[in-house]
């Protein structure tokens, strides 16, 4: 089957990118003919089936459409896999695919109205968490009626064995965090507040941070230097060498889909200290017990819950680690691709439900504005449809 993957970025570090790399490595082996198109990447890929459109903040929707139209033929007779469905509102009519399937990896502020603008543009949606399945189902009821919204297990390469750990009693507790050090979504400026709450509760802890970003220098000034280790960006064995030493993993994000880093940590027996933000991470953490989820963003409650966990017998904590590890069993690459292939094949075989011919795009003054400016001043202008 011809597959046309479409997303914004490929070269950055993130969960969507890790999944796209798996598709690049495995789609052909599974009998597909894949192509990859990236909106904001430059067109200098070594891979012959990769194309970058070179979009930037100065581009307008009008200029984006003109450039995208030059690559419309890539979608002919294919199933378009629209990762996070970016740009479909103003590009779908230039995408002559047999079917359009959304693969929703993420949650974000304004996701509900964004999804509502996708009505009639998609033939099915795969979601990485039950929370996203519920949201998509409520926003796109026509897809729900015909069972075209489905959960897909995010693939992770976990550790093959649980690392050995010294008992928590009488030693420093290691709390990890993974991500890009930025305000948008990750809200890393909250980490110092969490650290202060843990100190006030008398918890002997050490923060270990994996990642980098624009707020790193600020964090280095604000977090206690004697309790914080900045590891920078790591990958492969270096990444696992850090993560396997952690006792807990936390987050202070405004929103998440299902964090791959949390699943990877679970595979190493790392336990969550998870804020309740309505993500897939909340759901998995709650399966281990209410004490692993704290009200966002009540840092005092987070410290109190961690203190109650630390007071438990080591055998109870060990059992929780084993249960966390067991939660990742369903997240194999084999299961991910089995679900993906079966769903896409079914959608391709069943009648089309997305609009095959969309209305000609009318004149919108906003289509002439710089996209980067519009995302800040008038985000709704970025999702106007051809109607």
Task: Describe the residue ranges of each PLM region.
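Aromatic "clamp/platform" in nucleotide-sugar-dependent glycosyltransferases that forms part
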Residues: 254
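Short His-centered aromatic/hydrophobic patch
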Residues: 81-87, 104-107
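Conserved donor-binding/catalytic core segment of Leloir-type glycosyltransferases
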Residues: 4, 167-186, 192-195
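A charged, aromatic-enriched C-terminal amphipathic alpha-helix characteristic of glycosyltransferases
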Residues: 162-163, 314-369
């Amino acid at each position: 089957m011809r597959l046309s993957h479409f997303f914004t970025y490929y070269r950055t570090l993130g969960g969507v990118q890790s999944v796209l790399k798996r598709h690049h490595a495995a789609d052909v082996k599974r009998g597909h003919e894949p192509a990859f198109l990236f909106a904001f990447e430059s067109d200098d890929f070594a891979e012959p089936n990769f194309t970058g459109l070179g979009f930037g903040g100065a581009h307008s929707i009008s200029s984006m459409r003109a450039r995208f139209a030059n690559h419309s033929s890539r979608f002919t007779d294919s199933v378009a896999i629209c990762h996070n469905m970016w740009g479909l509102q103003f590009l779908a009519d230039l995408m002559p695919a047999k079917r359009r399937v959304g693969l929703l990896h993420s949650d974000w502020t304004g996701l509900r109205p964004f999804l509502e603008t996708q009505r009639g543009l998609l033939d099915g949606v795969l979601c990485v968490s039950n929370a996203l399945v519920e949201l998509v189902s409520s926003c796109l009821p026509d897809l729900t009626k015909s069972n075209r919204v489905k959960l897909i297990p995010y693939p992770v390469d976990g550790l093959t064995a649980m690392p050995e750990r010294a008992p928590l009693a009488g030693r420093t507790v290691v709390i990890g965090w993974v991500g890009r050090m930025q305000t948008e979504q990750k809200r890393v400026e909250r980490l110092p507040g969490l650290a202060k709450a843990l100190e006030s509760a008398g918890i002997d802890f050490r923060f270990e941070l994996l990642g980098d970003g624009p707020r790193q220098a600020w964090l280095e000034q604000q977090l206690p230097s004697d309790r914080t280790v900045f590891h920078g960006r790591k990958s492969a064995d270096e990444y696992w060498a850090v993560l396997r030493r952690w006792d807990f993993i936390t987050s202070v994000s405004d929103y998440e889909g299902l964090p791959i880093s949390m699943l990877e940590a679970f595979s190493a027996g790392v336990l969550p200290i998870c804020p309740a933000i309505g993500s897939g991470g909340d759901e998995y953490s709650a399966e281990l017990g209410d004490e692993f989820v704290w009200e966002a963003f009540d840092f005092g409650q987070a410290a109190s819950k961690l203190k109650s966990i630390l007071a438990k017998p080591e055998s109870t904590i060990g059992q929780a680690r084993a249960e966390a590890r067991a939660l990742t069993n369903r997240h194999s690459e084999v299961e991910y691709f089995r679900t993906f292939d079966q769903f896409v094949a079914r959608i391709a075989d069943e009648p089309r439900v997305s609009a095959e011919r969309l209305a000609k795009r009318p004149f919108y003054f906003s289509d002439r504005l710089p996209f980067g400016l519009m995302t800040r001043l008038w985000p709704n202008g970025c999702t106007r449809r051809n109607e």
